[in-house]
Amino acid sequence: MSSFRSIRSAIALLLVGLLCEITLGEVPILAIDAVYPPVLSTAHPNPLKISAGRFTQDIDALVFSDPRISAVLEPAPNLALDDVPQKNFGSFTVTVDPATPPGFYEVWASGRYGISNPRTIAVVPTPVEQLPGNIDPKNPIEVKPAICYVGTTKRSDTVIVKTKKTDHWPKCLIAAQVLDAATLPTLTVTDGKQTVLSQLRAQGKRPILFETPTVLPRQPVDEIYLKIYDFLYRGAETASFALVIDPPENHPLLTTAAWKPPFSVFEESLASWPTVDPGTIPANGLFPAPAWQTTIELTSQNPKAQIEFPVAEGQAYECEVFSASQGQLSDIRIVADRIAPAPTPEQLIEIQAAMDAPSGTALDPALEQRVKDYRPRIQTAGREVIAIAEDGPGAGTRAVRLSSADPIATIPAGPVTKNVRLSITDLQMTPSGKWPTRLTLRVGPAIPRFHAVGHWVPDTNNAVQAKTTGVSLSKGGQCAMQVSVRRAGGFAGPIRVTCENLPPGVSVVPAIIAPGQTETQLIFYAEENATSWVGTIQPVAKGTSTDPNNAMQELAVPIRAGTIALSASGDRGLPQSRLSSQWQLKVIEQEVAPIQIRAGDGPDWVLEIPLGGSGKLPIKAVRRAGGDQKGVMRPQNLPAKVAFGEFELPPNAAEATPEIKVAADAAPGEYTVWFQTEIILKQSLHPESHARLVAYRDRIQAKLADPNWAGDRPMAEKIIAETNPKIDALAKEIAPRDFPTFLSCAPFKLRIVPAPEAPK
């Protein structure tokens, strides 16, 4: 009987990975929502498993952001009566070189349906132990220092562990969201009599850190109990956490610096200016004339900072704050006003006397002016406000937002007889706030610049539905990268976007982000003869500006990779996105894409239309099996005053020539337009599972057909009897099915030129 159970287990092993996801309606692209454990040790080999995701079939390799971390796919037990080696797809043994610095890294999974989105992992020098999922609350596990424990929260269950109290209260660290986990951990600390000593909840990406009780126990305590659960009660494989007792001050899980929101790119590539230490500025003293940068800390006791500095004749300045971009839960406001220099001590005595004088007292005109100049220092009425800034300008998509709560403002040129005063507050700060707000302030001449962030286009641009996504570029197919930019420092020109380091057989159509636009898409195409490839690529954005001597200079910045770290959901709200360290691309060679749609005649082709004119756009489609349905093509990123509505690419049609009309008052320039094509594609999902089961059945049949085979013939006959119905059922499951999709495709350059002059 046990041998027959092993037969069923063997067949189930071949089927796993297909049937669990067979009902999904989206085009197959690998995405992972969790790896477990999310912490790796340099002290020993680490088991690591892809614990949650979509289209995770045949994950056979991991890519790490550091080459000193490597993974080997674990083998699976051989199938019954079979000697062909099997693979335990999605399960690995990971080795971390002891020379790898403790910190945060990224991992990508490579499988049948592309390469996944990155997931954050931490590397620690101590052993890592996994907490069991069924801890008896009456007999909790004891956790000790010098070990990193990892666990998951399951629905409303509470993970209970205990630790010793020695001559000091043990410091207890719990990290979760900095590891891309969906957990919002909550910690309740009790003594042995279940008296609550502290209750703590994570704030954003910050870890929980218990150091001393909020309520001191009445009796001596030898050990404390830690009750850990997910505040939102939605625990699952994606809701993991890490626990460390008495971590050293440099423990990587104590910091959130590695988890960078997309808008943190605004702080990158900026020239370093002289740093001013606020502690060296005397009370009511002046900062030097810009350019400079400084670091300020706001607290509930000191929630407002004021900085005053002189200005240069005719010089405008740019003032920018970086706080939320550094992981702070802040919302900074800056108010800039012009103010007369502070009076001397002798003048201040005269001013105070004049202000205390009875109403109607005649004053010397010079003294009256000094009183007038002094009042804005002690009251808000009458201030010469020149700038107010809160949130930065918005950009990005609803999936990966490039909008920052950090303000940026322009201080216009003004008279040197007055200083500029900056009043800085955090609108999120409360009188009982526990956490200080740290910020970097830069003030200096405007530097023309732009920053760019991209992300692989998810299957939806609806923020309520956006979820993690990887990338899969099939032979003869296409995939898309959304690119968002923010201009600053007076730069307002066009930005050219392209990609470098592409493999043979893969090309990209360069794009233009015109003045006034902030978005475009890069469309990647693979030829039919492209070969399998996995590697890093480098998208870049370029523009031109003038230097201080009015000479033309090229600006070039890498397009930073953005990724959805947490999918949108009803209980956790909009998707959460962060920056990634690199771009990974995978070319799939197992199949050819059902359709490829292009516009024009090559990547450098331009459709030129004069103002008030029209033109025909040649659309060409290469259709293959599964790509014969009609497509509704909707143009994206159209400039104003250009008429170009959606149109149909009829079933099986290989060409279309829609008309574009340009109004006489449109803005001349060069633009990139692409299409979002709504189409139903037919594909077989993971046909390899069927082929493997057939091959296994055939190997067993071959053994039975061999008269010299001395194996267990009754078991072999049983295997065949149980396998044949599975093969028939699986043949139906892998039959091509409909995948409704929105395909980004057919980019082209539209050049709008002035109308030709009428003949005289």
Predicted regions and their residues:
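Bacterial N-terminal signal peptides that target proteins for export
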Residues: 2-11, 430
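Bacterial N-terminal signal peptides
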Residues: 10-22
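Ser/Thr/Pro-rich low-complexity tracts
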Residues: 13, 25-156, 160-167, 186, ...
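Acidic, Ser/Thr/Pro-rich low-complexity intrinsically disordered segments
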Residues: 26-78, 89, 148-249, 254, ...
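Proline-anchored loop/turn motifs at beta-strand termini and strand-loop-strand connectors
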Residues: 37, 65-70, 97-99, 164, ...
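Aromatic sugar-binding surface patches on proteins
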Residues: 80-93, 205-207, 403-407, 516-522, ...
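Charged, low-complexity interaction regions
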Residues: 359-361, 704-716
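Predominantly extracytoplasmic/ectodomain segments of secreted and cell-surface proteins
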Residues: 462-472, 604-609
